Regions:
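Phosphate-binding and hydrolysis-coupling loops of NTP-dependent motor/remodeling domains
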Residues: 181-224
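Pre-Walker A adenine-sensing motif
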Residues: 1-13
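Pre-Walker A (Motif I) flank of P-loop NTPase domains
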Residues: 12-18, 80-81
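Short loop/helix-cap segments at secondary-structure boundaries that form the rim of catalytic
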Residues: 58-65, 75-79, 160-165
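Conserved P-loop NTPase motor cores
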Residues: 18-38, 56, 89-192
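Short glycine-/polar-rich loops that comprise or flank the Walker A/P-loop
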Residues: 46-48, 80, 146-148, 165-169, ...
Length: 224
């Protein structure tokens, strides 16, 4: 489990983006919450920070992790290792871009600073139909070298040139419809056909695909 947590979230300058994919009800949110809490417990680096960006305004990690608005992110970061950010739904894209750029500013101003930025509903901000903002391009393409790890949470694998070449792991709780099987194989090298029946027959199980090594592994639901 320890290696899985590091593969998911650790900003070590080696691992690239993690995509955690699944439709509502597939177990994705539970997995996120439990693995993030476990990672925070095991990682005692005082210079580490987690920023969870949740446009749906649903994620809570614990009773002490009170969600904040955009103007409270920096203050909360100074005091707490984890910050849950609920962007204003009427200005969501601008606020999310600001939050990402703020993390890069903090990295420049604080020696040893390391962070994981989890973006829920990532398909809203980066997809094949929409060019990524400068902030998201910076996060996806240069975050690793700055000690900032990107974790994209989406309903399905994100098809975007900005993300395809900078993804280390796909963690899939539901598999895409047949229409997208070819794209997934072409862009990430994953053939999902052998895993459709096992995933669908065991609720909350998931497929872990190492994009760099081209290796896939099925996992049973995590135990708490």
């Amino acid at each position: 489990m320890s290696k899985m947590l590091d593969d998911l979230y650790l900003p070590d300058g080696k691992r690239l983006t993690t995509q955690i994919v699944g439709k509502p009800g597939g177990g994705k949110s539970f997995y996120l919450r439990e693995t993030l809490m476990s990672f925070l417990k095991k990682n005692d680096d005082p210079d580490y920070r987690l920023l969870y960006i949740c446009p749906k305004q649903e994620m809570r990690l614990g009773e002490k992790d009170i969600p904040v608005s955009v103007d409270k992110i920096a203050k909360n970061m100074r005091k707490n290792r984890a910050t849950i950010f609920y962007p204003n739904p009427y200005d969501v894209e601008a606020e999310v871009d600001y939050a990402i750029e703020l993390m890069f500013d903090m990295q420049q101003q604080n020696e040893g600073f390391k962070a994981t930025i989890v973006v829920d509903d990532a398909q809203t901000f980066i997809s094949s139909r929409k060019a990524a903002s400068q902030a998201f391009r910076r996060l996806a393409l240069t975050g690793r070298s700055k000690g900032i790890r990107f974790v994209a949470v989406a309903h399905q694998a994100v098809f975007s040139k900005d993300l395809e070449g900078s993804t280390s792991y796909l963690v899939m709780f539901t598999l895409p419809v047949k229409l997208y099987h070819k794209d997934l194989n072409t862009r990430y090298g994953l053939d999902v056909e052998p895993y459709i029946e096992p995933i669908s027959s065991k609720p909350y199980s998931f497929l872990w695909f190492d994009v760099t090594k081209g290796k896939a592994q099925l996992y049973d639901p995590i135990e708490v």
